């Protein structure tokens, strides 16, 4: 390793490394720039390494392709070298057979007076002419000339004629392209640059890059130029000397004076060697040279093998030869080479010379004499094997060097004619002193030969015009400084303004967009100057009549009173934007990099306080960036454009990009959000996608001459300074933004950027004026915000109860945004919507809205181009609405808002086809006597399983002495110990205030929960009005169901019918039941379930509410959702027929479901009831009951109780809402009943769930399976069946308790679904389940039960809360005492008669008077 490289590797300090990287980057940047002109093409890595040996630097990022890129770059490298040699001479120069576009390669410009002469369209055409007839072409006027890549197509006579007819020409640099290896018919020495093809007559084809379309045909005699040292024509002679070589490109100098040539011309280094001739005749020897490495390897191999054969030699030769080289080899010569090695191996390698070690003088003299005699006789008698081997084992070196020779210029194209007479030069059309136009020269030359001029550079005129316009712009900017004003806020600009401006000159007339018609003469606003009016007209604001906002007249344009001095930009790539900015009177200001701001951002990124993509970069890169930000001394050229949303800040920029495509390659657009990036991509479709970037990716990728930062106020503080440090090649920054809108928010108070001003506040003083006008919003909306508007139509302000599906939704927080995105809504935050334009915008108001700043509200309210819809998801209480007064824009917007009603349509369901009867099957007999044995063996004894309480001892759940019966827990109401454990497990107490506080805290989330529910259940978006008729029918049905009880049941609840029974008191009992669930049979005993009893009048009210909401739900429930409520098993079976069993299904249970129905779900119930028009009085009464329910112990926490009217329906609705909030359900088939659910797809969890899951006390126990269970039914591809194991165990329990005759009728109905399947049960049951199924069938048949009809009976659990559905006759004596006659024409909501009752609390104070109908 060299000394400097060793020191560089020892650098460890980050600051030192950063400085070293800065130096390395500068060299890298200089290297990249140096490749733009002569070496711009893309090549592979191996070719790049070979080109570097020729002094050619390549750009690894280049995407410019060429059919023979390497050869073209070697040609340009040759011209670069000629250009260096031309610098030692005084111009101008003459270029022969030269394209004007190549002047830059030799370091010459278009305006330096050089002469260009083209005798033919292509240099190879000259080989067809006998002589160069220069009588009809301009002569060479200059002493020094360049003949470009043409010499190899000329004869010595033609070159001599060129000098003879141009006496002013003294020195000619001639480049030629000839491969020296063609002299020996060898393959290309530079296959990455060119390939060769040889012909039988000795000629060859030269193909650059292996591309035949660009190839040249050469005769063998052209190769003589490689050894040309002098040309003689009579007494006239020329001296030639080879100067340099780059691949097959060579530079020769040709002069009139005699200069001795070099002894040898060196062309290429090679390791080729030739072998000695050892066979006779001569053509049996090896003909071609081979690499010395190959010869030595083969020789050593042959010497290392004991008895080498010809086959061994061929095998080894193939092994050491690359496949790519085989195409260049001749098999005949390879055979000769193999025989050469075979012969060599046959000779002895043992030294047969005598040894001189240990001999005396006489002995040495005798040996010396004998060896001399052998050497003399060797030509006659031959050498020994060793001496023969040593004579040819060392191959002869092969060289490409040539000895210069002298050529005599013959007549015509021949090279070997003797010297002939030389004719005197014909008179030329112009004297040597006549000036020549470098652009006319080649044209005259080609016209003389009848060839069109296709070699002129067509871009010269464009470049000349561009440079002229650039000079005009720079002169215009330097005339006088522009005086402008800082744009004040609109509320500060109510009065007239008198800004000082510079009147535009006649040289700069105002322009309008090309695609816009010429505007009519505008009506001048009295406070605007002529320049202001012209600027607004250029932005398509023609109606400048005075418009009024909240604070008075609105001024469309505010100027900056500060004096700004513009700077000059000479970069030609920025010229179109400089022209555009000048037309809009926007100065370009030079400003030094603010190292403090740049360092603050770099430090925060390095410490992972800001950003996501940047923080993942290597620490070395981050430290280097930080160090560079602290020491940079760059100057920024900044143009700042401020204006309201829709004012046309970016219009002129986009027009420049559309109309001047050359700017696309040199422009980068940086946006703060992905939405804004997509917006730019749609408006500039021709711009490459990688030129439009978000701000973090832009920081990591290369910059361009012009960088546009749109909505730069949303970029982190210090971004522009940091970006400039990383991209010193940027010449112009164009910033667009609005200081009235939101800026980037740094949330970490420990971050360095937390204490910095925003980017828009930092660069606001550099802004010339503020455009306070918009094309986006109608005047109805824009004037409220203090903005002038050109749009007169539209501007509706609406209010909705639910968020529309297809609307663009704006919410105050990111958490709410994530939740709505999971609902497939296009949601953005108030602050994050900056840059958005939408026709209709929906703004959600919740408890976070009053916390938003004026800038945030202005941003949200200025997005709509047609209408704004407000959705209040939080509260309509006066207190909350008063808080909205803090946002003056919002307060004004909400004036005049109205609601619209919508009535959903009822669509009847289609009848489903019936299934054909199935064939009967027979099952083998199973031994059911052993079915209970595994459970009995693993079950512990009775005392261990029972629960123990200190007050009442142990529970009594294990009944009888039968071990089989003891497997099933028997919960009894009289078991006090079990009641105590049940109360501990199922009941939670609280206070009324705590319940109300919980209700208040969960209000916001409940609204979102309803949105999830409504989206899945297809709830109509508009609120539904109250339906008095439906309410009356629901009340009548509740009363009718209550009166269907037996007399004993009604009399048993007489105390709950007492008016003095407290409205909010709940009597708790223990539910008596046998527990038969499979997961609980034989397991440790657990707490039971409670039964709650409310006052009968409360039950009637809540049951009416449940039936009313159930009817409303049935009107919109989608077909893919099945709720097991008032449904038969046949209906459920038909629903399952379309179930997808080919994928994972999902079922779920919950932990303490009733106990987890807290304030969040109560708010959800209230929100849903409110949407369906339930009177507020009913909702207040329901809220009072739920938040102040009393038991003998204390006030209950908000939870679900079994005695409520809506228990089943509310449990089902909350189950659906929870499932929809957690998973992306869409159109999945699902069935729900209380806390039970099953779906035919395992849906993905929503991304927003992680933000809200901690707010749910409800905990699910999901199960992914291919055999889902629901409400005791197993769902299969052939329909629903009862679990045969559970069904058999339940029947066995009834048999052992002697109650089988009471349960067989209902069990037979459940059993029939599996029994009717016949042979199909083999497809759905496991071996164990088949055994239980057979045992059940046999037990049924033994009892004489042969089920034929099943599935038409209603389940008894669809209203489990008040247990009103009993198959008993009503009491005749009680029926006439209550009138149930709903009114024929129900009065409106306000006129419905209500029965009054008072809800009491222990201190006898009424909560409130509530009316019920």
From Swiss-Prot:
It holds the Pfam family Viral_helicase1. Residues 1143-1249 form the RdRp catalytic domain. Its EC number is 2.7.7.48, 3.6.4.13. One of its GO terms (biological process) is viral RNA genome replication. InterPro entries: (+)RNA_virus_helicase_core_dom, Alphavirus-like_MT_dom, DNA/RNA_pol_sf, P-loop_NTPase, RNA-dep_RNA_pol_alsuvir, RNA-dir_pol_PSvirus. Residues 499-515 have a biased composition (Low complexity). Residues 614-771 form the (+)RNA virus helicase ATP-binding domain. Residues 59-226 form the Alphavirus-like MT domain. Residues 421-432 have a biased composition (Pro residues). Keywords: ATP-binding, Helicase, Hydrolase, Multifunctional enzyme, Nucleotide-binding, Nucleotidyltransferase, RNA-directed RNA polymerase, Transferase, Viral RNA replication. Residues 772-905 form the (+)RNA virus helicase C-terminal domain. This is RNA replication protein. It comes from Botrytis virus X (isolate Botrytis cinerea/New Zealand/Howitt/2006) (BOTV-X).
